[in-house]
Every structure is written in structure tokens, then in C-alpha cells.
Amino acid sequence: MAKVELTAQALEQFARLPRTIQERVRKVLHRLEQWPNVSGVKALSGSLAGWYRIRTGHYRIRFYVQGDLIVVDQIGHRRDFYEG
């Protein structure tokens, strides 16, 4: 079972989400604790090789894995997620 941690940036982004979306994100983060047996995870490529993303509705969660630690560094709406 993996441990999920959020960076300061991800915590700020999470706090700005609507409450209903926060609950959905919490459920996804709880699912990530079952790494690597998590469905819906996509490995990113290019300059983000080694990173992963999982979606919940129109929102995306980006993270990387270090052993048994999953570090979430970005949470946001898909329209903003892939911008620089």
C-alpha cells in the first residue's frame, strides 16, 4: 500500500476546488493508495516522462511515484491542466 502526499502547490489547488470536486478528488487519492493496482492511470510522455495522471470528470491529478510514496503536484480542471 502506497502513501499519498500533496505538495504545497497541490494543497492550494485542492483548497480552491468546489466542495463536490474536492470529495471526488479525495476518493481518487484514496484509490491511489492501492498503487500499482489502480485503473485509469495514464503515463505521461515527452518532458513529463516518469509522471502519471488520473482523471475524475473534467479534473486531472498529476503525480509521480518514488517507491511506496506517491507525490501529487498538480490538481486542476483539464482546460488549465496542460498549459505551461
Predicted regions and their residues:
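Residues forming the ATP-binding cleft of Hanks-type serine/threonine protein kinase domains
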Residues: 76
